[in-house]
Amino acid sequence: MASNTPRPTKAERRAAARAKAKALREEQERRERRAKITRRSLLGAATVVVVGAGAGLVVYSRKNTVVGNSFPGVAEADGSVTFGAPLTPGTSNDGAPVLDVFFDYSCHFCAAFDTLHTEEITTLLRDGRITLALRPCKILGQNWTDIVMNGMGLVLDQQPDTALDFHNAAFSLFSEIYNSQDGNRLTVDELASTAKSTGVSGSIVDAFNKTVKDNSYGTWTETGTGTFKDKGLQSTPTVLLDGTQLDLQTLSTETALTEAVDGLAGGASGTPAPGDDG
């Protein structure tokens, strides 16, 4: 007999995301102690390397060294892209604190963070309470990061009004693939299908393959990665509010960022970001 079990509601999915985020934080504490050593090992490893919590999920080749010169017109010189109340790139909310999110599109912790806080961040933006600065980088060495960065670069340049939705959908897709451990789905076609679902036009989606093949936005990726390293950061996601690094353990609920913003006026505690003056 066919199952009539309904699909999980949005509330149920977000509750599951909260539970997963808690588990991931505990795992992250263990993994971050090994992170520096692991990344150094990858740099000196064989031409084809397997990394990730689920061995075999992602395979990348170090010989893919093509770097294109395209740079999104709305991106800042450091590679970041800001969003204000209109939810379009290159905008900001005057006088509002900046929420900086450093991430790698191949980071499942980043995907869990994004899934949990998507609606909250959208509300804070629309209410003019923050300016969001997305700060993509490539620290895990994965081809998937290049695929999404090139797709995102194209969307930012050609259909920017869909960029934030595309960003969130790309993370949602990665979470789904990561949880299924089906690395065969980490393809341009999967990303293209996701892009269409967020309203990206067919003509732009059709250009994904060539853009990825040419690594057209490779310079943008390298710039964001350089910014991450120059600031002395160690892992993703790294989240700053008004220049102060937030403890990920305090961000496990879907209202945690709002509470942090509320606390700014009262002198909320935090850690000054590495590389900043204070």
What are these regions (language model features)?
Residues 70-79, 275-278:
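C-terminal low-complexity, acidic/polar tails when present
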